[in-house]
């Protein structure tokens, strides 16, 4: 399908300090490089099928189970915010309002302006933060056909 898939580790998803520490900063540099060289990248926050490594990490580190769905969007927001601050010239799809909220909170002084409906249930917005602009597609987490990502990528990445 042409996507580069990056699966986050439990530590990357749940450790609030990860991306401000040495390993996290190095990971962000590598991710920047991947995004700069590839038109289609997915950040996957799911555990491998049949594995609940994120929950095990949370238990081992004293993180309440109720914190998991809060910390994952915050981590995604940190990653996306970092890419926007670096000036990544791309469009992003965020599934679920929690992910979008995590990104906006991380960016601090950000403005999200709806541009229009890309497809039914998918909103295209302009995200501006510290003079950096990018386009963001948002949709509810459970909405859409199985081919949604590839169909969108085909439309967005098609030469004009």
Residue ranges and their predicted role:
Residues 1-160:
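Active-site catalytic microenvironments in core metabolic enzymes, especially phosphate/sugar-handling
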């Amino acid at each position: 399908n042409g996507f580069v898939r990056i699966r986050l580790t439990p530590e990357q998803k749940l450790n609030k300090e990860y991306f401000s520490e040495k390993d996290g900063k190095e990971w962000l540099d590598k991710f920047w490089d991947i995004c700069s060289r590839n038109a289609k990248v997915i950040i996957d926050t799911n555990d491998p099928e049949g594995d609940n490594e994120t929950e095990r990490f949370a238990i081992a580190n004293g993180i309440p189970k109720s914190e998991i769905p809060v910390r994952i969007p915050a981590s995604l927001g940190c990653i996306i915010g970092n890419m926007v601050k670096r000036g990544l010239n791309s469009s992003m799809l965020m599934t679920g309002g929690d992910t979008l909220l995590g990104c906006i909170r991380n960016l601090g002084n950000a403005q999200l302006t709806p541009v229009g409906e890309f497809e039914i249930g998918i909103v295209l917005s302009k995200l501006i933060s510290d003079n950096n602009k990018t386009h963001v597609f948002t949709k509810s987490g459970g909405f859409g056909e199985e081919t949604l990502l590839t169909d969108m990528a085909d439309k967005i990445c098609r030469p004009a």
